[in-house]
């Protein structure tokens, strides 16, 4: 089974994955290639339900690719029951990259290049509620929890490799 990096948006999944041993696949990039536009544009045009359907199909495909693949998921991959069931089948390989809300919030706020609809369309308080709601979902799926605050992507990857 594949190694799957889970965690809230902005936690550094796509930054850590290339430092791990294996074939790196950025799930968001795979989805964008499939839909022919950015996820932000797709969300605006087709809505969240359509996006989550494509996300589930993509996750199922990627989980079948073999033991050598390192999948960097989108932060919302855990919100649908279908995806959680797929990830539970992958039980021994789910790594939750955890970061405090303030660190994640500030990273996303500074990332002008990568504007995220969930961030842009909610107040800080609403965004915190979304963050809090997802923490239990990540925890329920994680075989390994790595706190990434004050660690470089290389340090996080070294820690994961040691486990």
From Swiss-Prot:
Q: Which Gene3D superfamilies match?
A: P-loop containing nucleotide triphosphate hydrolases (3.40.50.300)
Record-level Gene Ontology MF annotations: ATP binding; magnesium ion binding; shikimate kinase activity
On whether Cytoplasm is a keyword of this UniProt record, the answer is: yes
Q: Which reaction does it catalyse?
A: shikimate + ATP = 3-phosphoshikimate + ADP + H(+)
Quick one: which pathway? Metabolic intermediate biosynthesis; chorismate biosynthesis; chorismate from D-erythrose 4-phosphate and phosphoenolpyruvate: step 5/7
Q: Cross-referenced PROSITE patterns, in alphabetical order?
A: SHIKIMATE_KINASE (PS01128)
The UniProt entry's GO biological process terms, in alphabetical order, are: amino acid biosynthetic process; aromatic amino acid family biosynthetic process; chorismate biosynthetic process
Q: What class of enzyme is it?
A: transferase
Q: Which InterPro entries match?
A: P-loop_NTPase (IPR027417), Shikimate/glucono_kinase (IPR031322), Shikimate_kinase/TSH1 (IPR000623), Shikimate_kinase_CS (IPR023000)
Q: Which residues bind Mg(2+)?
A: 14
Q: Cite the record's note on assembly.
A: Monomer.
Q: What does this protein do?
A: Catalyzes the specific phosphorylation of the 3-hydroxyl group of shikimic acid using ATP as a cosubstrate.
- The protein here is known as Shikimate kinase
